[in-house]
């Protein structure tokens, strides 16, 4: 029964700011949240107890989207500053920055290797990300 106490854990996380985007790691062990003043920060949380593992300023303006790569190695963020940033998942270090674009959505597609679908309907292959 779902209401049984051993299955229900009530946990609250007080970020004190709006949340603009949320994604989960492919293994579902981590939750990644964009929040903070003007939603510029990224928080890595442990999914089991919501412990904050990392918190860092990611963009100069609000983050509009977060996505995890399918292999779980990277988190990709897009912000109103027009940048797409690629973060090493394990270290939270910045791995790469793509040139400014008007990004409203992002996704990774398994069938097409990996690519980002951005607002301008330009497909960027994963190889192109590392060449920029």
Swiss-Prot record:
Q: Which InterPro entries match?
A: WD40/YVTN_repeat-like_dom_sf (IPR015943), WD40_repeat_CS (IPR019775), WD40_repeat_dom_sf (IPR036322), WD40_rpt (IPR001680)
Alphabetized UniProt keyword annotations: Repeat, WD repeat
Q: Which domain of life is it from?
A: Viruses
Asked if the Swiss-Prot or TrEMBL record annotates the protein with the keyword Repeat, the reply is: yes
Q: Does the keyword Repeat apply?
A: yes
- SUPFAM superfamilies registered for this protein in UniProt: WD40 repeat-like
Q: Where are the WD repeats?
A: 14-53, 58-97
Coiled coil start-end? none
- Its recorded name reads Uncharacterized WD repeat-containing protein L84
Please name the source species. Acanthamoeba polyphaga mimivirus
